[in-house]
């Protein structure tokens, strides 16, 4: 447990710029477990804090996201909004994202679990989490934002020192 706390501190504070003692977590066995755990935690957050029903909660992620995201949707009985990406840069189509969010609201979706990738497994694409959050905030929607950094998390923060994909961004919660 002491080693785990030390590793968490290095990752959270030194790599991802969290405030000291502002984080919690554990070392997962892999990215699949970490993603499922994050989505499970957020589903329970919405259920416990907003009395949300599972059918009111939806996961949003790109079509290039890790297979663990649709798996989590299946395990936790949540819908998944799969957002298409551009062919060349593999970045989400923001206009489709907005249309899908608007359509989800008409289908009684009130709570959004966003998974933004810090390096997709197949292409290494780094998504801008603000693309998701700007639209959700435009419509004043409740959301939680998870960064899937299983693939790029040990490279991207060091290769892009100016990145804002870290815990200095108050919108990112895991």
Give the residues covered by each predicted segment:
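Conserved PLP-enzyme active-site core in the AAT-like
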Residues: 30, 34-174
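Conserved N-terminal alpha-helix of the aminotransferase class I/II PLP-enzyme fold
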Residues: 1-31, 45, 49
């Amino acid at each position: 447990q002491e080693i785990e706390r030390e590793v968490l501190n290095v990752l959270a504070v030194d790599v991802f710029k969290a405030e000291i003692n502002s984080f919690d977590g554990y070392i997962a066995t892999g990215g699949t477990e970490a993603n499922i755990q994050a989505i499970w935690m957020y589903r329970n957050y919405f259920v416990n804090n907003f009395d949300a029903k599972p059918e009111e909660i939806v996961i949003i992620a790109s079509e290039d996201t890790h297979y663990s995201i649709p798996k989590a949707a299946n395990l936790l009985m949540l819908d998944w909004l799969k957002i298409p990406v551009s062919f060349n840069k593999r970045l989400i189509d923001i206009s489709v994202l907005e249309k899908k969010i608007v359509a989800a609201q008409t289908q009684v979706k009130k709570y959004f679990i966003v998974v933004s990738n810090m390096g997709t497994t197949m292409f290494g694409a780094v998504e801008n989490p603000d693309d998701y959050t700007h639209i959700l905030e435009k419509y004043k929607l409740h959301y939680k934002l998870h960064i899937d950094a299983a693939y790029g998390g040990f490279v991207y923060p060091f290769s892009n020192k100016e990145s804002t994909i870290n815990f200095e961004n108050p919108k990112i919660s895991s």
